[in-house]
């Protein structure tokens, strides 16, 4: 897999393929490398974002804006199965490394904000444009407040994940199903968001409903909210169904609520959501989060604390499943990070190699794989091509 992308979406796709077992080669500009290397937080000037999302691949530098660099890229591509890119549409063609210039057996993953065609295709943009035009930003937040972005770059990650799935399917069709040719996967950041909008488009089409922000609640379920606790935390309780509501009432020692005509059915509880959520909040407010969670777990009520990262890395479930691994970074040494996900039962755990230094593997890639001599590589370095 050749990762010729920048920032996050295409590199994340390549990284997922690497965590499935692919060999990934990161191709970066000689001056500075991937922009991801410049994004904080930093430890002694070194990007921790890069330490996570640059892992599991080798780094080779190459100036794709110059004809010799383009020629070398085509030579490298002859060894590849998949190429992942997220340049503005037309850039690969301008550099003579687009689909028409490459082996048709390649699977070319192309990610951009708006896709390769359409009236907005040439606009610049990042994750924020994806969640904006995809409709997620409008739906995120509280009804009486402006739209807000989700806590992480959802459209970049989601598009990368969808594209990794598509790349594997394309390889399967090429090899196992005998198609013989690869595929061009054309993905937009906003399109990945559209795909997870649940019933939003269908309800607008059939009922004229324009879905609005709902905060932590759902319009057709209650009690359901993030409730305050005595120790300044928030805890999510989901007890919309009749069975879960009865269990919660028993846990709160408020069984009489199950007979209250305002709460006897799901529809009635949803219609009186402010009231029932207020009752639950009154129960949680004087109690600590751990006490509330233990009580709900004992009663078989769905519950979750709103975890900070400190909670995550110390949680016994995370530890038991190996969801945080220690990656040996070439600059920082051991760094705890998210483990590859998902995992196959019975397969040995995968611990990715650390994110490479810029051009760390130039000799391996350009000499051992592509076939340049040491003198040729030195000449290219002197010219700034690598």
Q: What is the meaning of each model-derived region?
A:
Residues 31, 113-115, 189-194, 231, ...:
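Glycine-rich beta-alpha junction loops
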């Amino acid at each position: 897999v050749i990762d010729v992308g920048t920032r996050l979406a295409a590199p994340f796709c390549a990284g997922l393929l690497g965590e499935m077992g692919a060999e990934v080669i990161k191709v970066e500009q000689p001056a500075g490398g991937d922009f991801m290397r410049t994004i904080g937080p930093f430890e002694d000037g070194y990007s921790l974002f890069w330490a996570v999302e640059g892992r599991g691949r080798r780094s080779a530098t190459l100036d794709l804006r110059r004809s010799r660099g383009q020629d070398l890229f085509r030579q490298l591509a002859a060894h590849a199965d998949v190429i992942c890119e997220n340049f503005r549409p037309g850039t690969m063609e301008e550099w003579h490394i687009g689909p028409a210039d490459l082996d048709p057996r390649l699977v070319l993953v192309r990610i951009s904000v708006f896709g390769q065609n359409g009236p907005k295709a040439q606009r610049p943009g990042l994750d924020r444009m994806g969640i904006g035009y995809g409709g997620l930003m409008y739906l995120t937040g509280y009804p009486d407040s402006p739209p807000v972005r989700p806590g992480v770059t959802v459209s970049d990650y989601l598009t990368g994940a969808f594209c990794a799935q598509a790349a594997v399917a394309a390889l399967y069709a090429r090899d196992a199903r005998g198609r013989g040719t690869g595929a061009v996967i054309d993905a937009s950041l906003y399109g990945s968001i559209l795909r997870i909008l649940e019933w939003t488009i269908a309800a607008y089409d059939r009922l004229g409903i324009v879905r609005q922000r709902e905060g932590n609640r759902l319009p057709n379920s209650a009690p359901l909210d993030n409730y305050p606790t005595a120790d300044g935390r928030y805890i999510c309780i989901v007890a919309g169904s009749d069975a879960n509501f009865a269990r919660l009432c028993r846990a709160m020692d408020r069984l009489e609520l199950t007979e209250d005509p305002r709460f006897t059915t799901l529809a009635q509880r949803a219609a009186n959501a402010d009231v029932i959520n207020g009752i639950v909040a009154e129960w949680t407010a004087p109690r600590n989060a751990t006490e509330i969670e233990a009580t709900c777990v004992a009663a078989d009520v769905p519950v979750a604390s709103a975890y900070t990262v400190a909670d995550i890395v110390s949680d016994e479930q995370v530890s038991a499943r190996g969801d945080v691994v220690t990656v040996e970074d070439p600059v920082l040494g051991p760094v705890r990070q998210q483990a590859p996900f998902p995992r196959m039962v019975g397969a040995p755990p995968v611990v990715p190699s650390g994110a490479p230094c810029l051009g760390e593997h130039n000799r391996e890639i350009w000499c051992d794989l592509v076939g340049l001599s040491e003198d040729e590589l030195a000449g290219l370095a002197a010219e700034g091509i690598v």
